[in-house]
Amino acid sequence: VGYLQNVVAIAAGELTSFALMENGEVYSWGYNSYGQFGVNNTSASNYPVKMKKVSNIIQISAGEDFLLMLDADGSVWGVGANGDGQLGLNNTNEIHLPQQMLKENGSGILYGVKEIATGRSHSVILKENGTVLSLGYNGYYQVGIGTNSATYIPTQVVNESGEAVTDAKHIAAGGDATYISRNKDSEGNNQGLYVIGRNSNGNLFTQDTGNKRRATKVQSDKDIIAMALTFNHDSTIRQTGVIVDQDGKVYTVGYNGNGEMGN
């Protein structure tokens, strides 16, 4: 018996905690009713349990009751709740052992992934070429494809003109919304963010409360270096957005019923 050591990253779902180890292994503990521990059962645990089937994991991201993992080969593994197809397996089956996400056409394994992010029940994938894929629950258009139909395989995120997003630098997701920071343009100018999805609390930095069906530009003359979307829910979802610029300044927007905005 001892402490969990050599942890390099952590993630948390609604009632489940995850730890990524230096050697690429993943451990889970807490609630496991959707099989999100990845050990082929649904038994809860009050101590860390080693996930099966995965190795060489370099990133983890937890949704409400599911986990995505990025491995060193650039493929994405998923486990747990999948009722909205958020694991990218072209089905809605609950998954108790990690499986690899499929390509955009649903055939073969997806590779070339740089970053992963998860909302409540949707997933966002940043590819090495700067394009963004999304999938899963889409009731508030958070998948960024222009409609609110759920998608069970990775689907190309499009901008306001219906063209594929190609200039993405980093991604963040939370609740029913998505942020995408953008690379500088050809002249070296900062381009701010794309925002997508649920905006009922004004959490998308667009100075309104309308949901965004496609990746919508939010201009900034500062480089965005970190982003996060938080949410809580009892009878309704409440969301707050946070970004950090190149000068280390923090900006918050959205729900502030408990002082979430820090102002």
What kind of feature is each model-predicted range?
Residues Y27-Y47, W77-L97, L135-T155, Y194-R214, ...:
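Short glycine/serine- and acidic-residue-enriched loop/turn motifs that recur at repeat junctions
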Residues V8, E14-L15, G24, E64-D65, ...:
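Short coil/turn segments that connect the beta-strands within blades of beta-propeller domains
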Residues V49-K50, Q99-G106, T155-E160, A215-K217:
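A short beta-strand motif characteristic of beta-propeller blades
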Residues G2-L4, I60, G106-Y111, G162-T166, ...:
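Short glycine-/Asp-/Thr-/Trp-enriched loop segments that recur within the blades
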Residues N23, N32, D73, N82, ...:
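Residue-level signature of beta-propeller blades and closely related beta-rich strand-turn architectures
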Residues T16-A19, S28, F66-M69, G78, ...:
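Conserved core positions of repeat-based scaffolds
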